[in-house]
Amino acid sequence: MSVAAEQNARAAAGDQRPTMTEAARIYARMSWLRIRRGRMVWMAAALFALPLVYVAGLAIAGHWGRGLFDDINELYFRFLIPFVPALTASAAVAEEIENKTFTFVFARPAPRGALVIGKLWATTAPAVAVVVPSLALAWVVAQLRFSGDMADTWPHLLRVELAAVLGLCAYGALAAAIGTLFSRHPLVAVLVYLMLIETLLASAPIVLNLVTIAWHLRNIAELPLPDTAFMAVTVPWWGSALAALAVTPGLVSLTTIGVNGAEYRTDR
């Protein structure tokens, strides 16, 4: 059943208001149909394919083991996991605000949170579905020469996978939140934030780098962390996991508030 037919059937049945789950599912379906027709999704897929080419090249050059795998992880956590969601999610909600179309999807008012959840699901779920197996494949390639080490390194793989999933969700929610606030130029705003905060501040030798998503993801994935001047800071990996996990619902709530107030804004 098409989206329009589903809405008409709901109206004919006399439904007063779609539930959060139903509305989010419809928003996600509509968003995915729009995304897969565009070029951005193919650009993101091509970017996520780069690490597999990279790991193959390094393996041919004689690099193996956990060192090779962590070299690949640097590519994921410094560039792909933060910046690909910026391409796919920054304008997901912002375009609805700019075009003022978020109020016309349903015959009856739908929960505003459903728009945010549906849009994020449509942009984040495909990225997770690509990154999780590609990381596992990179790990297998890195361990081929020393396959006996797989039993010792698979817990590291699990922590990397956890960090990747949490990172994609958090950065997708971050991109949507910033894009909602700066809906005229969402991608530019998100890229500026990522470069200033998630890249420069996260690598600075100061305790403030703990406020960045990037620092906690690296802590979860057992990647090198910047030295902290004047004081040593140690956070258990599960503490970073809880922090990264809390970011997504918090940013989704902020984005929902932004959507709720969008129809009353007069600056557009």
PLM regions and their residue ranges:
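Aromatic- and glycine-rich beta-strand/loop motifs that create alpha-glucan
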Residues: 2-45
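Terminal transmembrane helical anchor/hairpin motif
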Residues: 2-7, 58-66, 181, 186, ...
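Secretory targeting signals
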Residues: 11, 15, 52-92, 116-185, ...
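Cytoplasmic juxtamembrane interface segments
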Residues: 15-21, 93-106, 170-197
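Membrane-interacting alpha-helical segments
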Residues: 21, 25-36, 114, 155, ...
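Helix-loop-helix units of permease transmembrane domains in multi-pass membrane transporters
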Residues: 28, 91-126
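Transmembrane helix-loop junction
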Residues: 34, 95, 108, 139-143, ...
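Hydrophobic alpha-helical transmembrane segments of multi-pass membrane transport/permease proteins
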Residues: 37-60, 75-86, 190-200
